[in-house]
Amino acid sequence: MEHAVPDDALARGLEYLRRNGTELMGVLAAHSAGIASGDDVLVHLRPYQNDDGGWERFDGDMEGSLSTISQTWLGLQWLLWTRPSDTTPLDRTVEFLRRSQHDDGYWDEPEEILKYDPPPWMIPGDFSNRLWLTSAVCCKLLELGREAAVGLDAAIEYLRKGWDGSRFPGGQHTHWMAVYIFASLSEPTDLDRRIARGCASRLIDELSKGIGDALDVTSIAYVAFRSGTRDLFDVAFPIVVGNQAEDGGWTTGYDDIHRPQCTIEAMHLIKMV
């Protein structure tokens, strides 16, 4: 099934970000539009990577310069999408994630984050938060082909323990990440196949009912495309296309501060498809 995209979608998105985004958001959009290189992007990415290899301060969800898992996986995503010729930032990011993995296989935010009044999805010690952070890291490392750098088997086993037969605790994040993770394993078990299919079916049902923020729907369409989960993609992608607003940017219910990121992710998906 083919899905129509307006011819000017990328140009309108780029113009929106030139008016409303930071320099980083603008160059990421230019990369998505095919007019900036990964090396151009890296110039603007570098200030967000800390000395320990972790990343901070991308999305405005909290103050401070602490390296967090939720920001580091986003930095990993930008490096994955833009592929700068200097791989040192990527290597440092992967090493930070290797050091940050807990013995039981999961990732969690550091306790120090509590000093900065983080949002609920960044509170350490919460099982559902650990699941989505672990799934986020695994998803991007698998896509990069760098999963051997961490204890992937332990991380996957931790995720399996969160599956109750029909869903993971928490929101949609762990579910859409799990679609890609459990479809990408070289030797999946029957449980892994059930998890991948169960997550896809759940997301299809929720999207069909209008459940899901625009930013998350873009991520869902992305992993569906990358994993070859066509039925999920056929539901999610038309919603993504329809979420472009009159001003050229993509909508999100999280907050206007997240619209530039939402716009970049939608542009990248459209270019890739």
Functional labels for PLM-detected ranges:
Residues 1-273:
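Preference for long, amphipathic alpha-helical scaffolds in soluble/luminal domains
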